[in-house]
Amino acid sequence: MSLNIITEKDKKQSYNLNKLQKRLRRNVGNAIADFNMIENGDKVMVCLSGGKDSYTLLDILLNLRLNAPIHFDIVAVNLDQKQPGFPEHILPEYLKSISVDYKIVAENTYGIVKEKIPEGKTTCSLCSRLRRGILYRTATELGATKIALGHHRDDMLETLFLNMFYGGKLKSMPPKLISDDGKQIVIRPLAYCKEKDIEKYAVAKQFPIIPCNLCGSQPNLQRQVVKEMLQKWDRQYPGRIETMFSAIQNIVPSHLCDSNLFDFKRIRHGKIPEGIEGDIAFDKEAFSPTPLVQENDEKIDFIQGEMISFKEVN
């Protein structure tokens, strides 16, 4: 009898994992298609830190590649920053076990940061700049045409509010960007993925997670405050996070105040400029009492034979 109970439990866990994987595949596949992130012949350099996000990114991209209508290569890259206590064996062992091409780049950025930044001050800004330069250089050396990072939907929303609260800008993380010199394209295939889905997936897949606090840097208190605010909203108002993310995909420049995005000086009597959305000067806007955007876990887009296919991009 106990064996039957275990079997039923295993079946349920397997079903839940399969459902979760399909959702992540769908979200990643849609993001890749919507923003033309990966093209035929690309070599995608997946930046692997050893955290849940980058493990999930690599796993889902490998899964998608099996049935993708285009050919692209994947190489995993980890930057060993020589932090004390960093378990150097974990990532090579894992990557060998799944037969993925990889490169470990050893650079003592930890030592540079400790030398330049006074004790007790946050090291994240300098560390980030150093990492970016090394990863761009590595991408060039490997012939990579795309650099894939593991930022997800929650990261993008947190960044939006951080920029509004502390930077006075309406700015988030772009799903796709080009480096200042025009030589590197960075993509974020997890842009449509929820952090809690990634957390569940990482636990279910038993990825060998490496702690992210080895550098001893001060926590980003501003980001933590924003994260907790969004989590509270998500608990109190189901669907609000989805609606907010939808909002950053539906920008109406004529109803904001940035003259760089919309030329308000063109507005004259008798002529309606292109890009203006409706005359609502004296209207009281009506909103639905519940969020308009509700995620449907059962909706499967771009599926062929249980595997995601990319949209055709002109």
Curated annotation (Swiss-Prot):
The keyword Nucleotide-binding applies. The keyword tRNA processing applies. [4Fe-4S] cluster binds at residues 124, 127, 215. InterPro entries: Rossmann-like_a/b/a_fold, TilS/TtcA_N, tRNA_Cyd_32_2_STrfase, tRNA_thiolation_TtcA_Ctu1. One of its GO terms (cellular component) is cytoplasm. It is found in: Cytoplasm. Its cofactor is Mg(2+); [4Fe-4S] cluster. It comes from the Bacteria. One of its GO terms (molecular function) is sulfurtransferase activity. This is tRNA-cytidine(32) 2-sulfurtransferase. It comes from Histophilus somni (strain 2336).
